[in-house]
């Protein structure tokens, strides 16, 4: 396994402090706390109180305050309910005595029922597309600051169908949709917790920027007059999946108003099955 992927997996793991209390750390090479990391660490903390007897089917999270990358994050798990079919956990992420993040999660016992799935978008497969790693290496030659984002693509093979990079300057209005193929660069352990956490991590990669496409803006092109941040994040897990196999992340933004953008995305496996759905509201504040 390549060292960057190993580091990310270690980062997404949490340390048990005592019953219902866990500790996560931050990446030394990143000068911000990535939302996908906090999502994954919160899921890992809840998972430790449940195990693999139940399937995670949904999370609903709020980002309350910016995180401090120089301090560990404590995760307090509240065991709201342990029912016959469903289990509920509420998780608070705490730094310096204040909550920076809260999440509710629901878990279901294994059941079989009715099935259907919307069709996967008709887009080129990943084999014909350029890796984001290659594109970011070139961009970093003129924008060294993007290296703090690019290191993730040493671990995650990400390929854009429309070839739109989040950190690349843009002044061209585009339709509010993007399609990205994603998977880890190396095989992962079979542990379901690892795949849940990795998908949560990947679901926050280049998601918010979809809401900027119709306005000819990008986080990379508006560094001095644009403020962006995730406000909330939701995930629904529909079917079993592996994060080390190709997944298509089909993203769209149906609305932006009131300095907030709304984005949603669907994850499909290569067989065309819908395996997860994501949604997020984000701050997209333009400074005049």
Please give the residue ranges for each predicted region.
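Terminal targeting signals and extreme-terminal segments of soluble enzymes
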Residues: 1-288
């Amino acid at each position: 396994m390549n060292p960057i992927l190993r580091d990310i997996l270690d980062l997404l793991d949490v340390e048990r402090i005592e019953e219902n209390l866990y500790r996560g750390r931050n990446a030394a090479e990143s000068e911000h706390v990535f939302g996908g990391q906090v999502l994954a660490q919160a899921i890992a903390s809840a998972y430790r109180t449940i195990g693999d007897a139940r399937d995670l089917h949904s999370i609903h999270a709020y980002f309350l305050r910016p995180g401090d990358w120089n301090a560990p994050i404590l995760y307090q798990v509240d065991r709201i309910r342990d029912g016959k079919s469903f289990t509920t956990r509420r998780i608070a992420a705490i730094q310096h005595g204040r909550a920076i993040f809260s999440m509710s999660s629901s878990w279901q016992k294994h059941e079989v029922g009715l099935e259907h799935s919307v069709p996967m978008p008709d887009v080129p497969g990943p084999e014909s597309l350029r890796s984001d790693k290659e594109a970011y290496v070139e961009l970093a030659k003129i924008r060294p600051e993007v290296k703090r984002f690019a290191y993730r693509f040493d671990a995650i093979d990400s390929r854009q169908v429309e070839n739109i990079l989040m950190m690349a300057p843009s002044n061209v209005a585009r339709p509010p949709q993007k399609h990205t193929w994603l998977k880890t660069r190396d095989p992962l352990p079979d542990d379901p917790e690892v795949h849940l956490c990795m998908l949560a991590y990947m679901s926050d990669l280049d998601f918010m920027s979809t809401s900027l496409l119709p306005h000819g803006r990008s986080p990379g092109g508006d560094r001095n007059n644009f403020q962006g941040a995730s406000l909330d994040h939701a995930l629904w897990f529909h079917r079993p999946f592996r994060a080390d196999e190709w997944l298509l992340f089909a993203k769209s933004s149906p609305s932006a108003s009131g300095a907030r953008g709304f984005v949603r995305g669907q994850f499909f496996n290569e067989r065309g099955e819908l395996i997860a759905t994501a949604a997020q509201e984000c701050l997209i504040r333009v400074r005049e």
